[in-house]
């Protein structure tokens, strides 16, 4: 598939990830939440648990797994963005049940890995 730009490509794979997670029983809360310091790709619910999902794509695994591209800096930005989103929605990390997952997509969507609790605070 040919994409006009990286944002178009990102939207395509984020939608693929959302559809995949829906088939696994999660429900979409919102997507593409932007803050000046970071973005939340997908926010889903898995029962009573709020799930912040980072979607990563690599055409192939020759240079590593897509999940390996979630750097320490990226993890810190995701945690900060999630805390901001929870505060804006009258929640906080002490009262809300939440986790950070990564959806790693390879080979134009032919292979999808779902890593639950892939990002932990601290």
Swiss-Prot record:
Record-linked Pfam families: UPF0102
Molecular function, one GO term: nucleic acid binding
Gene3D superfamilies per record: 3.40.1350.10
Superkingdom field: Bacteria
Family named by the database record: Belongs to the UPF0102 family.
NCBIfam families according to UniProt: PRK12497.1-3 (NF009150), YraN family protein (TIGR00252)
Listed name of the protein: UPF0102 protein VC_0580
Lineage: Bacteria, Pseudomonadati, Pseudomonadota, Gammaproteobacteria, Vibrionales
